[in-house]
Structures are given as structure tokens and as C-alpha cells.
Amino acid sequence: MDLVSAEQHAWISRLTAAQQAGYDAVGDLAGLRFAVKDNIDLAGLPTTAGDPRNTTPAPTSAVAVQRLIDAGAVPVGKTNLDQYATGLVGTRSPYGACSSVFSDHHVSGGSSSGSAVVVATGEVDVALGTDTAGSGRVPAAFNGVVGIKPTRGLISTRGVVPACRSLDCVTVFARDVSTARAAYDALVGYDPSDPYSRRIAAAPVPARPPVIGVPDAPLDLDPLHEQAWLASIARAEELGQVRYIDVSALLETAALLYAGPWLAERWLAFGHLLDDSPAVDPTVRRIVTAGRDLTAADAFAGFTRLAELTRAVEPTWNEIDVLLLPVTPTHPTHEQVAADPVGTNTALGRFTNMTNLLDLCAVAVPGPQRSDGLPFGVQFLAPAGHDDLLAVTAARWCGEEPVKVEVQDSVVVAVAGAHLSGQPLNADLVGRGASLVGTTRTAPEYRMFLVGGPLPRPGLTRLPGTAASTGPGIEVELWRLPTAALGGFVGTVAPPLAIGPLDLADGSRVLGFVCTGDAVDPDRDITGYGGWRAYLASR
């Protein structure tokens, strides 16, 4: 590709050649050079977060940086960003605005602007960024590179200047999926000293082609983006089965990010630094200062609305494996951003802001180029823990060799009550790496009883020879759970419920929730409803 030659303002600080030579380039990533977004600590250099008043060198490197170093990669320096990682444009920095490597008239995207640029120009092989609202994907799209935004908590954020700490993710930029994935593999790992670090089992990758969700309504893209998007849908049809779905709840969720709890969280993180100093970007000050006046009532209203939208989105993943979306609706010029800095930025987050709120993982990859020569980026999204599936899908999209992912043994578990999709304990299943297989029914001999307790649940018992033996059986969902996670899951099941053999209507047998005899109370028999959802609907 032809890259612009104008000054990119991509670097804030660099290590000297002597400093770089001091690292032992031994390990799986030996020979790779990497850059670090300047809100992530690299020992010996200041972490400015885009604020030149922050001049103290970091005494140690962030966990993510150190993991790359330990794997043999060599750090080169720190990259420019929208100040305090607040922005998707790449222009809100006293160190200068970054441009797309394809056009010095168009913005680079942010907030991880410099990281995407130095990968695109070939100055480094890999760069670290962060992604709260899309900062690891928008710059990837605007510079024609790959951007991995992992499941929240898979990569430690210890040593990262917080923007919105409960949502922040460390991300990876590279020119191809395989290199990005190699860095990702080195970065992932539980950190007991990071309160937001999580242990999440990797969901198994199906051998069949993926079912790819595509929005069933127009997305209000600019005309050149629209052409590239239609070409992207055609390419998706070559990868797997395309299914058109309603994404309105996802897009509504995106609008929540700069409201309520999450704007207040930004104010909590660095609002005290946004004084009248000329070093502070005025747009960043204007946006974040609004969080100062939000109340606890505003916060809980936001949490409640997010919970409602999360429930609305959950059934989507029963229909598809991954969701395909554009990364942005347009690619603005510097002049457009200057004329409307907040409105333009808001538009850029339309398809990315919801990702961390809904606990999704994502990967941005180059799509068909626009007719004017600018890049067009698409993203694949999936529920938490499905990072391997996204890597495999992204590699196929880019025409690369298959990404090597660990194939996990798994077991199918039938659930009938509180672990059903949308029910209170479903998150426990998903958090252990389970993926929905489908809905079916038990053999007709099963009866369903109401089990009391703080959380009412159904208990299934097989009673051969009863009147129910000619019925349709009880509705259950089948979930595929990594075998390694089965023991921990079974340990959460308290009497009178247990995990045991469960016969299905088709004659097959799986593990499932059953109840012991002391729960079989004829007065609490709710078999006639045919399933837990129908019972709840009758209440």
C-alpha cells in the first residue's frame, strides 16, 4: 500500500538502541519489536497518558509489557494517544494529531492512534493499545491492520492508567492475525493482583463453518463505507452461513457508555487532573467533567438499563456464533473532527461502544477497500471466552493459515431452570466457557417439581410408568462445557439438585440437572407447564 509521508506524531518517547539491546530476545516472540501505548507502563520511560505534565519514569513495566518481554519481544518506545484514552479520533493530544497512513487528510482513529500507525508503517511488528469504547479497533480499521480486543480480564491491566477501569482492556495490533495471536497468547493469564482479572475457560471452536450474524436493517453508513460493507457481507457468505439478525439492542447499549456510571468512572479515574492547564485537551476536559455531577441514582439507573439490554441481547447468541459489523460508519477528515469534535467521535463509537458493556470479545480486520483508496475495517464479535473462535474466523477472513488453538474436550450438560439463557445463573455457565448447543426435551417419563429456597428452581425426576410417560417431556437447553470446567460447575450444585444422567426425547443420554427423591412432592408438581420458562410466564 502507498503510505503517506507526512509527520505522523506517532511516537511520544523511544528507547535508545543501547536500551533496546539490553533486552534478552529469547523466547516464542524472539525477534519481534513492539510499541506500547503511552498509558501503559514501560520501565524507564514516563507514562504520560497524553499529558506532558506526567514526567516521572515508570519504575516497573505493566504486567502486559513484561509478559511480552519475557516471551522475547523487544520494546521500542511509547506511542501517542487521545489524552487519557478518551477519544476515538487520534487528534486529542498535545503531542500532535495522528493521521491515517493512507491519507494525511483523514484521522488515524484513537485513542490508540500511535500504536496502530507504527504497526501499519512497519516500524514495529506488534503494538499494545487499550480498548474501552473501541480504541483498539477504530485505529486498526483506519490504518488497515488487525486489532484484537480480548475478553475483559484475560489480559492484566495492572500498570495501565485507567480510563474506565471496570471496562478497560489491553489490546494487540499487528499486520496479520497470526502475529497478533502470538502476542495475545503471551499476554493472556490470570493476575491475582488485578481485581478485574478473570479466569475464563476458552470456549471450544466448532469444526463446522461459523454462523455469522449480520444486521437485518440499514446501518446509516456513508456511501463509500456502504459499498465496502455490502462487499463484506458477500465475503462473509463464503466463510459460513450468514443469518440476518436484529442488532437494535446492541446499538442502544453503545449509547450508554458516555452516560451514567461509566462517565462518572472516568471522572473518578482522572478528573482531578483536568484543571485549567493548557496541557489538558479542552474536549477531554469538557467530556469527562460532565461526570462530576452524576449521582448514585444516575449510576443505578444506568446499571439497570444495561441489565435490561443485556437480557435483550442474550438470545442473539442462540442463533449465531459470531456477529459481523463495520468498525465505524465513516472515516472523517481532520477538518470534520475539528468542526464537531464530540459529535464526530460519538458517531465513530456507534458499533464499538457496547462491546465491553455486554462482555463481548472482538477482533477488527481489514475489509474490502473503499473506492477512494481508504481502508474499511470490519469486526467480528462473540460472547466472553470465544476469543479462539474469533481468531480462527479472522484468519480465514484474511486468507491466512489456520490459527492454532487448543482443542478442548467438552461435555454436554442439560439445564432446565436457573441456568437457562437469560436466567439468573446462566452467567456462571458462560463464564466457565460453555456454549449453547440448542433446545430440546427430556424423555417423556420425567416430571418437574418446584424446589424451594432463596432462588426457586425446578427439579427433574424420572418416574417411569407415570401419566407423564406419554407427554412431550420437559424443555431443556443443552450447553457444551469444557471438561476441565465440569468439576467446578458440579461443585456449585447443592442438594436436593445434582448433576446426573438425563435421558432426552431422542433417546440420547447427557449429563443434566436432576433432583433427589426428597424433593418429589406431589403438591409441587409443575410438570404440566412443560418447562421452567412456561411456569415463570404463568406467575
Language-model region placement:
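Short glycine/serine-rich loop segments
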Residues: 61-62, 66-187, 356-379
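Acyltransferase
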Residues: 224-246, 271-276, 299-320
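Short helix-loop capping/hinge segments that flank enzyme active sites or metal/cofactor-binding pockets
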Residues: 29-49, 209, 261-310, 314, ...
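A short helix-breaking turn/cap at a secondary-structure junction
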Residues: 149-230, 392-407
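Short Gly/aromatic-enriched secondary-structure transition segments
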Residues: 14, 48-52, 425-442
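Glycine-rich, small-residue loops and helix-cap segments
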Residues: 70, 121, 181, 187, ...
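Long, hydrophobic N-terminal alpha-helical segment
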Residues: 407-435
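Short, well-ordered alpha-helical
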Residues: 1-57, 62, 84-87, 229, ...
